[in-house]
Amino acid sequence: MPIFQREGHLKYSFAAGEYQAGNYDSASPRFGQLDLIYGLPWGMTAYGGVLISNNYNAFTLGIGKNFGYIGAISIDVTQAKSELNNDRDSQGQSYRFLYSKSFESGTDFRLAGYRYSTSGFYTFQEATDVRSDADSDYNRYHKRSEIQGNLTQQLGAYGSVYLNLTQQDYWNDAGKQNTVSAGYNGRIGKVSYSIAYSWNKSPEWDESDRLWSFNISVPLGRAWSNYRVTTDQDGRTNQQVGVSGTLLEDRNLSYSVQEGYASNGVGNSGNANVGYQGGSGNVNVGYSYGKDYRQLNYSVRGGVIVHSEGVTLSQPLGETMTLISVPGARNARVVNNGGVQVDWMGNAIVPYAMPYRENEISLRSDSLGDDVDVENAFQKVVPTRGAIVRARFDTRVGYRVLMTLLRSAGSPVPFGATATLITDKQNEVSSIVGEEGQLYISGMPEEGRVLIKWGNDASQQCVAPYKLSLELKQGGIIPVSANCQ
């Protein structure tokens, strides 16, 4: 896709580390990378970046624009200097062109063309591999140009079809790498299925590779059953069947079981995985086996944010997040965020949020507990990309009380009188008296005094001391009678 950013906004990313190449005997150089994208007026975007390593340096400059009806385009150039084997230096440029267009008919077209203008240009990966082994295929298949085309057509209720084309050629080999893939995705009721075909011709092989596949998924309540079969040009077949789904009220416990069989002596294979999303992180355990192996794997992943109100553990963090604060509501859960719950300090992290859009954060009322009331059970935030925004929920921590208030003469306190808990705390607990002196009020301590006022004169106010009997609690509400004096 072409590269774009909203006008006046800057997006940046920085990475540093040690590069691990796919070739097992390749070097592992350390590197640093910085990328910048800035939104210009008139629907244009400027972007660039730099990558620095001991034996490789490159920088990129580019510009993009959305032309509306015509489509979106971005163009960039990369200048790179590589130190290869035997201290041999190589310099070159790479030019890239990206185009995308969506039509009202439901057609999406994308074209991405890459051309390396000189044979001296190497990507960071290519330079690392060639430096490790000058006689390897990494040097032989040094890309000169590549062109990609993607076409998708929506068919409404009948699904969609797609066609992908890719061609690469090389500086040190006359052959070309050609890849074609096409397929259809459809649905009958809740059952989804797909049919696909792919063809690949590599310059290092005389024959092409062809693969046909069929996949179908059937819903089973909170689980899915899946079947997939593939066949290549030599008649070799691979079949897989499996079941996956979720458990628990928040659907934060996931599982999958899969069994497969391949022809030509490969035999059976299978795997089973269980994953749990908790408030402080994710845990995954899995087992897999095949003809010549058995493997057990496990992982623990999470995030941590240090902020003005403490330290909060979370699930793995996304680019844009929401830090919610719900004082006193430990273990309260967030709607549509499996496993996210408030910790003992009253904080929680919603690890993913949509930038530049209104995100609604809601608490599950059934997870708040009888001693917590929230003034507004949902908040709305509009974060910028890469930001951590805070959503605060005002809470009342205490008992929910249905109080019957009687004056000294035995008559009920007047309808519409204000009732306020007498306390030295900053948060005010108040409510309005209903008919027959009935008062519902939350956030109340086990014992205290309530100031009742229905006017400004001393004769139009009184104080009602009370003490709750916790054993009388019914449905989370404690009834109590109090004399207002």
Curated annotation (Swiss-Prot):
Pfam families hit by this protein: PapC_C, Usher
Gene3D superfamilies named in the record: 2.60.40.2070, Outer membrane usher protein FimD, plug domain
SS bond partners: none
GO annotation, cellular component aspect: cell outer membrane
InterPro entries listed in its UniProt record: Fimb_usher, FimD_plug_dom, PapC-like_C, PapC-like_C_sf
Membrane topology qualifier: Multi-pass membrane protein
GO biological process, one term: pilus assembly
Alphabetized UniProt keyword annotations: Cell outer membrane, Fimbrium biogenesis, Membrane, Transmembrane, Transport
Factors inducing expression: Induced during the exponential growth phase.
Major subcellular site: membrane
Compartments (UniProt record): Cell outer membrane
Molecular function as annotated in GO: fimbrial usher porin activity
Known function: Part of the lpfABCC'DE fimbrial operon. LP fimbriae may participate in the interaction with eukaryotic cells by assisting in microcolony formation. Could be involved in the export and assembly of the fimbrial subunits across the outer membrane.
Family: Belongs to the fimbrial export usher family.
Protein name: Probable outer membrane usher protein LpfC'
Organism encoding this protein: Escherichia coli O157:H7
Biological classification of the source: Bacteria, Pseudomonadati, Pseudomonadota, Gammaproteobacteria, Enterobacterales
Gene assigned in the entry: lpfC'
